[in-house]
Amino acid sequence: MSMTKRGILAGLIPACLAAAVLAGAGPAPQKQKTALFVWGGWAGHEPKKCVDIFAPWLESQGFKVEVSDTLEAYLDAAKLKSLDLIVQVWTQGTITPDEERNLEEAVKSGVGLAGWHGGLADSFRSNVEYEFMVGGQWVAHPGGIIDYDVDIVKPGDPIVKGLKRRFHMKSEQYYMQVDPGVEVLATTTFSGQYAPWIKGVVMPVVWKKHYGKGRVFYSSLGHVASDFDVPEARETVQRGMLWAAHVIE
């Protein structure tokens, strides 16, 4: 065999071996999704109990989950932007300018944000940019704990698809100021029994929206942890978190 042929073969062997290794490796493994739960604020909304419902569930879906009981979790801007999802469960209270800015910039950059009831839409009443991000703010719950119905209005959306078109709640019926630009998935109608001037008002209950590149999901259900014993209330939050994290479209 000539030296030229030997040189060609010598060059082909490692190339073929490399190709075989790459072919056997298969597709590169997908990066594990990451989520941060931040809970605290008013204890009456049972934030820890609610987190204990949804954090383990997200782990069962393959997420790496971190739980924090301080808003100081928002001080690490780089870490926030590395996440796939932030779930905030924090009613009332105050947030520092740095914490707020880092949270908002993370969502604008593409990190998902999800939450429910006062934990997301009655958090920081003096922070209008935060409210702009969420898409709404609680203002009243006439009658307190009452019986009311929730109607699915976009039954084809993946977050609510297959759920009962109307389901019952015994909880606070949130009256809210809502951004008209949100995409409403479920509503409730006020009877006027406790505030006659709002009789017949149709109020958004579940919505989704964007803030910059980030997806934002909200449900007004979930005054206390036992509210999530209602399958539809629990399922909408579960799917909403997945949507915000780009797991479902």
Predicted regions and their residues:
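Helical hinge/lid and interdomain linker segments adjacent to catalytic or ligand-binding clefts
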Residues: 2, 37-38, 42-122
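N-terminal export leaders
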Residues: 5-10
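Bacterial Sec-dependent signal peptides at the C-terminal "C-region" and cleavage site
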Residues: 18-32
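Extracellular ligand-binding/catalytic regions of CAZymes and related secreted enzymes
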Residues: 28-37, 60-63, 78, 192-203, ...
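A glycine-rich, often tryptophan-bearing local segment used as a flexible ligand/cofactor-contacting loop or short
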Residues: 93-162
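Structural detector of well-ordered beta-strand residues that form the stable sheet scaffold
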Residues: 112-114, 185, 217
